[in-house]
Amino acid sequence: MNTVVGRRIINGRRRPRRQTRRAQRPQPVVVVQTSRATQRRPRRRRRGNNRTGRTVPTRGAGSSETFVFSKDNLAGSSSGAITFGPSLSDCPAFSNGMLKAYHEYKISMVILEFVSEASSQNSGSIAYELDPHCKLNSLSSTINKFGITKPGKRAFTASYINGTEWHDVAEDQFRILYKGNGSSSIAGSFRITIKCQFHNPK
């Protein structure tokens, strides 16, 4: 006996057999993304600074300062010397101030200015001479001079004033001598600027 199994035809196509096993539903995959810890570059601590930001002086530290002072009431016939170092009484902030706090110093520049206070009818001049080793007691040359009726200015750098090496604070570095050939009336004043360096604090 022949058994005929009927198959259902829909729209001219055979209907596929229903699969007895259902397709397994894929399990959801949970991805946990961990945040990457950012690595901070260590800060470089500046030399000479502590945690509070204050400057910590290191051994042998120094300082640079500029001083301006004047020598007033110069007569047309005045003469004298300005000694730069502990003998500089015209600038106590330098001689009795900074020099007391360090063991060594050097003056790297000096600017000598003449401020005229004489009338145009006066005559004469004030000669000056640089003594880089403090050996002269009086003016030996009158080549360099300021006329008393007009202002003048002269600058000396370190190589001229014995300022390339350190000096003990107990010794003077250099000297400027001056002498006028005018009358006894007031001729003007000197305005002096010095640039200094200090080394090895006490």
From Swiss-Prot:
The keyword Signal does not apply. Keywords: Capsid protein, T=3 icosahedral capsid protein, Virion. This is Major capsid protein. InterPro entries: Luteo_coat. It is found in: Virion. The N-terminus like those of many plant virus capsid proteins is highly basic. These regions may be involved in protein-RNA interaction. Residues 1-64 are annotated as: Disordered. Residues 10-24, 38-49 have a biased composition (Basic residues). Residues 25-36, 50-60 have a biased composition (Low complexity). Transmembrane segments: none annotated. Major capsid protein that self-assembles to form an icosahedral capsid with a T=3 symmetry, about 23 nm in diameter, and consisting of 180 capsid proteins monomers. Most of the 180 monomers are the major capsid protein, but a small percentage contain the minor capsid protein, which has a long C-terminal extension. One of its GO terms (cellular component) is T=3 icosahedral viral capsid. Pfam families: Luteo_coat. The keyword Phosphoprotein does not apply. One of its GO terms (molecular function) is structural molecule activity. It comes from Turnip yellows virus (isolate FL-1) (TuYV). Belongs to the luteoviruses capsid protein family.
